[in-house]
């Protein structure tokens, strides 16, 4: 309560006419981190309840925690297994001493040995994820506050979600300066230029990742970025299938086959938050239950993916193994599940009419499979599919609204 009283006591200095008026956006950003603003709608018509933008964004933020924690554990576990597979004895000690992630883990009580426990794996994964997240949060937050100061309006909480989503869809080895550059593009070009929260037509986190993908492909794709172990190279399961079919799915470290359950649980290399479909489903159930995410969009994405993947299965191909990938493998490989649950359902860049949500979701699922199967240079397809569908979302809503108007005119006359 002392903090709240302090913030209330100094608030008048930041209001119009106060000596710190130009810093109101920064004050408001700090204050709303700790307390919900007391502003309510004063003019009709409106319905009041306990849900506001801040609470919605915080719930989405919490919903990605299962995927985030599993992603850190998996990133650490993959790195430790790879290091002990390649090095031993004094050679391993030299490698550990030369990488701050490794020696920091040991300094904090963790272990890089082959028998490292859950805590050590989580700790090592955290040394990769948390710096990326902190960089994204600080740099993106800087741009948010700067634009709010120039426009003289409050800071919205949408960036809490954008920052963590962006940090979860990049490799654990992404250089921090590229993380800063990617979120800068996402916030400034894909969001603030169009007016800020609620006015962007592209998903900012995906737009930032797309920028990095085309500007710095070596650091965000390929075989060397997914496992945080010095000197280790290993393709993702999706890339393995693209080059050799289901028989090519092997653990890059042990050589054992990768089962569907391995991919579903998340015991495979990949972007930090995308590997575990199970963890993503737990978070998705939370936001669907609270009606933050649209079940229609999720169902539409599944329908589009199943329909097109089944069509490719029927057609078949002797030269392209991706034609033969069944729908249940599309679900657990790559960024499909993460994109379906947390990116496609972004209420700002998605369709807002019920019928539009169905077509929007179907387009994403269909486009994702088409890009994965037909495009030989890019085995992943969810990012481009969602950004493509973002462009069509207003069209779907326009068609639905126009048809509703015509139907009502025909029903009730002039």
Swiss-Prot record:
Family: Belongs to the NqrB/RnfD family.
MF GO annotations: FMN binding; oxidoreductase activity, acting on NAD(P)H, quinone or similar compound as acceptor
Single Gene Ontology BP annotation: transmembrane transport
One Pfam assignment: NQR2_RnfD_RnfE
Species the sequence originates in: Vibrio parahaemolyticus serotype O3:K6 (strain RIMD 2210633)
Protein name: Na(+)-translocating NADH-quinone reductase subunit B
Domain of life where this protein originates: Bacteria
Compartment(s) where it occurs, according to its Swiss-Prot or TrEMBL record: Cell inner membrane
Cofactor or coenzyme needed: FMN
Subunit structure: Composed of six subunits; NqrA, NqrB, NqrC, NqrD, NqrE and NqrF.
Keywords (A to Z) from UniProt: Cell inner membrane, Cell membrane, Flavoprotein, FMN, Ion transport, Membrane, NAD, Phosphoprotein, Sodium, Sodium transport, Translocase, Transmembrane, Transmembrane helix, Transport, Ubiquinone
EC number: 7.2.1.1
GO annotations of cellular component type: plasma membrane
Function: NQR complex catalyzes the reduction of ubiquinone-1 to ubiquinol by two successive reactions, coupled with the transport of Na(+) ions from the cytoplasm to the periplasm. NqrA to NqrE are probably involved in the second step, the conversion of ubisemiquinone to ubiquinol.
Membrane topology value: Multi-pass membrane protein
Catalysed reactions, semicolon-separated: a ubiquinone + n Na(+)(in) + NADH + H(+) = a ubiquinol + n Na(+)(out) + NAD(+)
